[in-house]
């Protein structure tokens, strides 16, 4: 009800605006957010995690037909109809931002709205964005439903599209979505044909959602994450929640809890079974329950189980188990298989200190934007390169700044051992922190809740996620109080942080950014504090930097409630281009023109590594100070 009720409060004037100009229009006809229920063909594939190889998964990445216009009035309004001729259209790579493929202008700004500028003849006025200057990209491609999907449910998933889009299949309208960093899904089963099918997306560069995506990054547009289909039986596993903790006396015994939601219908009495296996493929826990009804809406809550001397997950020893879930029909035949990796670990604030498995942890962290030559589309290979470099340089924590990352990133963090601060895709920096802040405007609550909920539901089962973050640099007010309340109602274990909450109730960690060493010392000297000080950002690794790191870590290693922080940031957000003479060079804000384009210049380059992941010299300083073993010469 919290999500639906505010949508009917809009004024007549707002109702006359298109959906992409309304703060209430967070989505239409989308499936409820849930953990990833990857389809697998058999149990052996769950261990490998190779869901893309499943016969019930179909990628729609690749070449799409594309048409780009400078304003909505000139867009091809009927392009979504299969009969519409696209023979003269260009091809575009999906995923990939259109500015990196020859359309529009890549703009880099920091804390301002790029459209709040004379270049676009517009002053910020939420929820409105420029109309005449708002670019629209029309995407189309065809596909055939794979053999073996007959009689099964089919879901379309768009992992990330910025900033707002409408979607059709075979000319039939599915809905729309706003919010570029979490998946949106639609059930398209009854829209499909036996032969060729047509999918169409109409994408707007700016929307009301842009007011919540004012992050320090290149402002780009288009389909920037994967698009795919997956298929389930008519009765299917809709969601599941794994709680895998340690008992809090000795932190040696594992506590396993499992909830499974089943959707759809079946003709007989179905059952759900789970198996938990260790790294040697030995079954350590299992259970089975019959569903209470043949219809949809079944929620199965398994009894809590204990696992003595469990192999604990942490960043140094990322011990993982494999959970296998099987849905079975009345005859005991397996109709669906899915699963995930499970790590037993406890993340908590204990006696004023941030602890993993009961042990205080020093956060040796870094902030990470998603950045590549394609824009904000990052390949699996580049993600693996990032995490290997981080581990090689003693980094143990990554803050997903400032939005949920690609789903593969969490799998890597689970496997390699990296603590994750998962952050909701909310930053309204350009509105400031005062009375105009969107944090204080309750008409924006549905959007804040939607983004927070989608972050939590998709990533709730990852052991690497040890802290949730409500967002970044968006002021504080009723909307962040409500998102904190919601998260704490569903998350009983992991801490929640928000930098702009400062010492208000809606943060479990005092996580101010760029505070001096003296400020930290003064905080931990107080007698009234009960939250650890962990800087969500510090050092700002631009140019020849990180020179004050030693002084910070003298405090962190000697003051129990000062527990480190996350360096800003991991990678330079620049692009490598080639001039007319064949020489390469780095580009920064403003380099793509025109002359008066909004720009923060080379402020996009604050990384410990450059844009092609070559380490800067100060990364070695970080490696030295972040090392876990310190030696000193003594006289004997």
Which residues fall in each region the model found?
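Accessory beta-strand-rich segments of carbohydrate-active enzymes
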Residues: 19-22, 50-51, 67-69, 97, ...
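Accessory carbohydrate-binding/adhesion or oligomerization-edge regions at the termini
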Residues: 14-118, 198-202, 206, 279, ...
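Beta-strand-rich binding/interaction modules
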Residues: 167-169, 253-291, 300, 633
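Bacterial Sec-dependent N-terminal signal peptides
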Residues: 1-16
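Short glycine/proline/serine/threonine-rich loop/turn segments at secondary-structure transition edges
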Residues: 149-152, 192-196, 306-320
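Extended substrate-binding grooves/exosites of carbohydrate-active enzymes
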Residues: 16-52, 122, 172, 211, ...
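Surface beta-strand/loop "capping" patches
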Residues: 234-266, 617-633
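Low-complexity, Pro/Ser/Thr- and charge-rich linker/hinge segments at domain boundaries
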Residues: 224-241, 344-359
């Amino acid at each position: 009800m919290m999500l639906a009720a505010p949508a009917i409060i809009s004024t007549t004037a707002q109702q006359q605006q298109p959906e992409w100009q309304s703060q209430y229009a967070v989505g239409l006809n989308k499936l409820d957010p849930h953990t990833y229920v990857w389809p697998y063909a058999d149990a052996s594939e769950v261990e490998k995690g190779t869901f893309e190889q499943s016969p019930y998964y179909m990628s729609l990445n690749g070449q799409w037909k594309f048409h780009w216009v400078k304003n909505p009035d000139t867009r091809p309004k009927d392009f979504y109809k299969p009969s519409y001729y696209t023979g003269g259209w260009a091809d575009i790579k999906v995923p990939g931002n259109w500015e990196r493929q020859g359309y529009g202008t890549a703009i880099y700004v920091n804390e301002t709205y790029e459209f709040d500028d004379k270049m676009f003849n517009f002053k910020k006025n939420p929820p409105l964005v420029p109309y005449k200057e708002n670019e629209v990209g029309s995407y189309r491609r065809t596909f055939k439903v794979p053999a073996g999907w007959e009689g099964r449910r089919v879901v379309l998933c768009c992992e990330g599209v910025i900033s707002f889009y409408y979607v059709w299949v075979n000319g039939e309208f599915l809905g729309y979505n706003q919010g570029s960093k979490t998946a949106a899904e639609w059930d398209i089963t009854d829209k499909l044909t036996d032969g060729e099918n047509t999918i169409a997306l109409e994408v707007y560069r700016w929307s009301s959602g842009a007011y919540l995506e004012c992050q320090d990054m290149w402002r780009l547009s288009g389909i920037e994450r994967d698009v795919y289909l997956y298929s389930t039986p008519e009765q299917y596993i809709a969601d599941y929640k794994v709680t895998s903790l340690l008992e809090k006396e000795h932190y040696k015994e594992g506590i396993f809890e499992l909830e499974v939601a089943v959707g759809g219908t079946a003709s007989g009495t179905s059952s759900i079974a789970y198996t938990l296996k260790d790294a040697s493929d030995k079954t350590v826990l299992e259970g089975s329950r019959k569903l209470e009804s043949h219809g949809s809406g079944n929620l199965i809550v398994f009894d809590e189980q204990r696992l003595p001397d469990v192999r604990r997950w942490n960043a140094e020893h990322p011990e993982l188990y494999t959970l296998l879930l099987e849905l079975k029909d009345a005859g005991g035949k397996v109709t669906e298989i899915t699963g995930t990796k499970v790590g037993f670990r406890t993340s908590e604030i204990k006696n004023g200190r941030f602890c993993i498995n009961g042990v205080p942890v020093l956060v040796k962290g870094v902030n990470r934007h998603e950045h590549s030559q394609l824009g904000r589309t990052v390949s699996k290979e580049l993600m693996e390169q990032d995490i290997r470099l981080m581990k090689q340089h003693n980094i143990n924590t990554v803050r997903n700044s400032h939005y949920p990352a690609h789903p593969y990133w969490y799998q890597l963090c689970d496997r390699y051992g990296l603590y994750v601060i998962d952050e909701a895709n909310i930053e309204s920096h350009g509105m400031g922190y005062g009375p105009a802040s969107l944090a204080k405007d309750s008409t924006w609550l549905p959007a804040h809740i939607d983004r927070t909920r989608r972050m939590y539901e998709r990533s709730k089962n990852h052991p690497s996620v040890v802290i949730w973050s409500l967002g970044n640099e968006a002021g504080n007010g009723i909307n962040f109080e409500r998102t904190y309340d919601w998260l704490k109602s569903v998350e009983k274990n992991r801490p929640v942080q928000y930098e702009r909450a400062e010492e208000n109730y809606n943060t479990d960690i005092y996580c101010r950014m760029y505070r001096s060493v003296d400020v930290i010392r003064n905080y931990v000297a107080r007698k009234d504090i009960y939250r650890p000080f962990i800087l969500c950002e510090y050092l700002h690794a631009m140019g020849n930097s990180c020179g004050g790191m030693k002084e910070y870590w003298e405090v962190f290693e000697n003051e129990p409630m000062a527990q480190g922080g996350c360096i800003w940031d991991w990678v330079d957000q620049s692009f490598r281009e080639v001039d007319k003479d064949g020489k390469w060079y780095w580009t920064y804000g403003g380099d793509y023109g025109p002359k008066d384009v909004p720009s923060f210049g080379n402020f996009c380059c604050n990384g410990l590594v450059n844009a092609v992941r070559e380490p800067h010299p100060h990364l070695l300083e970080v490696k030295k100070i972040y090392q876990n073993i310190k030696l000193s010469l003594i006289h004997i």
